[in-house]
Amino acid sequence: MTRTLRFPAILLSAAFIAAACSGGGGGSSSAPAASEPGASESGGASGGPVTSGAAGEINVLSLWGGSEEEAFKKVLADFTAKTGWGVKYEADRQTYSTTLQSRITGGNPPDIAIIPGIGFLRRFAKDGSLKKISDLGVDASTLTQDYPEGFLAAGTVDGELYALPAKYNNKGTMWFRPDVYKAANVTAPKTWDEYKAMLETTKDKPGAMALGAKDDWNLTDWFESIYIRQAGVDAYDKLFSKDGDWTDPSVQKTVDTMLEAVNDKYVVGGITAAVGRAWTDAIAQVFGPTPKAGTFYEGGFVGGIAIGQTNPDLKIGETIDWYPFPTVGNTDDVTTFGGDVVGALTESEGAKAFVQYLITPDANKVWASTGAIVSPHKGVGTDSYPNDLVVREAESLQKAAQIRYDGSDLLPAGIQGEQMGQALQRAIAGNKVDWADFQTRVKAAWDAE
């Protein structure tokens, strides 16, 4: 069936994602960081010189950590090998947007940076900090041959391309321990009611669900995955646009539905402990050598972290796997994704070389081969991915009837995931959220753009 593209707020139809399985992928959420939108894993700054080259050196600033960072370093090493440009690489996983803004304001921007959310992309493009892709030696009009149209739109502001899609991950992946499910005599649930029944059965075998809500963006992903399935795609599109109304009853209804699973009864250690727990520690509660729970919700990037960092002895299909986020309400076959875009903040020759390298199939195949991401480049086929978990992730996006960008990342800079996530932290702790106040702040942020 032919599916059409709608794009009032970085919205994607699966027709443009077919390349993920028949020759390429599409762009996502990455995993964000403890206290900053878009960042990867909890922890401080990292990075340092990665490569040196005869042509000179560029400065690259990233928000990634763990397996995502290691994958990116392989891309940087390949860039040096192919172009002769060295890379001074820096990463800040906790205060990334503040660090990047300070560098820009101080007149010392990195040559290349990962942009922490679409709100920041709009800000940096409009204030002139980001350079147009067309000014970096790339004919932007030809890129539709290599990327699904919607993913290019993710880096576009007022009709001009400022950033390139780097990678994406499906946010509709529910991760679990097959051995725990088997021991509890449960199967992967398909509906929300079945999901709650599974939690009830496994709550003491050894525990139902792990949660790392210290990184509050994890809660925004929960909200978005339920909202789009319960309220529907049109309501989702509106909520995460400047026309959104956070006092609409559908918002609190989604929170109430979320609390049916995210509560003291089912979250290992209880909600108070979960609010103080990093999301990577929650992954370890499920996929460590001695599991404390059977289920963990987050995007496709979890597999690379669990296998690459948490427990290299995991076996796909035996001790790690995923199934689609359960259906909620009447909306079926929809999902969300998160993605990162890369932009240039200088027009140096090295920055131009990196942007030109990044759009090549080779660069994207190096990235895909690590298993940390799904590439949006059409030149990347499923044979580029290292395991079945990532192949199925790409296929799931290709098959979805409708797919939407991570909603919190569409909100204006300064609101994005942090204020939304903080509101949801209060909600799971049993406190009433003042959505009218949140609506006032969101509207003011939209009006200020």
What positions do the PLM features span?
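Short, solvent-exposed loop/beta-turn-alpha elements that line the ligand-binding surface or hinge
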Residues: 134-147, 213, 230-253, 308-315, ...
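Extracytoplasmic/periplasmic solute-binding protein
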Residues: 160-166, 172, 196-244
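Conserved N-terminal structural module of periplasmic/extracytoplasmic solute-binding proteins
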Residues: 7-10, 22-122, 127, 139-142, ...
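Extracytoplasmic/periplasmic substrate-recognition and gating elements
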Residues: 309-373
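Long, aromatic- and glycine/proline-rich binding clefts that accommodate carbohydrate-like moieties
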Residues: 368-419
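Hinge/lid segment of periplasmic solute-binding proteins
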Residues: 47-52, 118-172
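Glycine-centered hinge/linker elements that transmit conformational signals in sensory
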Residues: 241-275
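Conserved C-terminal helix/tail region of periplasmic/extracytoplasmic solute-binding proteins
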Residues: 182, 398-449
